[in-house]
Amino acid sequence: MYGFSVYLNEAIDRDHIDRMVAAGFTGIFTSIHIPEDDSTAYLDRMQDLGTIAKAYDLSLVVDISGTSLHKIGGSFEDIRPVIDLGVTGLRIDYGIGFDMVARLSREIHIALNASTLTEQDLEQLHYYQADLNQITAWHNYYPRPETGLDMDTFKRHNRWLKSTGLRTMAFVPGDDKMRGPIHAGLPTVEAHRSMHPLAGTLDLITNGNIDDIYIGDPTISREVLFQFKEYIEKNRICLRMESARDAVAERVEWILGDHTNRQDAAALVIRSQESRRQLRSNDPIKAVNTDARQFGAITVDNEGYGRYQGEVQICKVDLPQDEKVNVVGQVVQTDKSLIPYIGPGQTFRLLQK
């Protein structure tokens, strides 16, 4: 599942939710115990958010503390008013005993703090007869720089969580409007704090033993949202590129669009398996812009490479100048972190920035 965050310190932006749903996101996270927020508007805004969530059949998970449910008209003794709002899950961190967690799990989905969950905690849940099919493991996000989790420790712990049958979830930061008061991104893993949100997502999926990913910050840019949409709906990674200064325009236009990395993936470059077949002209490709190739360089083999003429490649590492290879463009800096996730058989699209 892919989800996003909507915070109750501002009026609910229906247009933003519409865009996220259109891109394939199916879950909403919100919180009712953020110290900086004015909680007097929580109930009205939660009603608005719940109505939208129900209309789109979205999951809606609310982060709560031991004393916050009354802010949205509910209580631990009677959770039904919260469910009626459209809330499908409660994210519980501290201050609530496992006996209560177990009872709640028989009525509503419960997300527990993945980072601190232990074997003894699971034994307590079993003891109190929790519905473990209703319980998942959600990591926190970390607003302060330098406090996010270490990736190695994180993935080891997630491996254990998944071995118990629990589904895992983590946050990646946005790249547009950052949540205050620190405005430094809301990642789970520290290494993702300044990373492209989709690259952080792919890292969690590929390396982090994570099932569900949510955007922690309130928004992502339109360009990044499009990249998420392409990946969620078509399993395609989109890379934005800038043309080399002296690149021949028709050659740049020719390489834009969809490609597939060869199944026998190369170590140093991404090789488009379609590119030589798609060469539109029998005219030889002359040597031009045969510069040194930096990480993220987009290249076309010229006539000097014989039958390889027309092959489009993206450099995964810095490579030296080669008279037989034309540099036609460069993946933009922010998208370079997506390159390592274009593995064997992965489709990708080149877009002009």
Protein language model features and the residues they cover:
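Active-site mouth loops of central-metabolism enzymes
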Residues: 1-15, 62-73, 116, 183-195
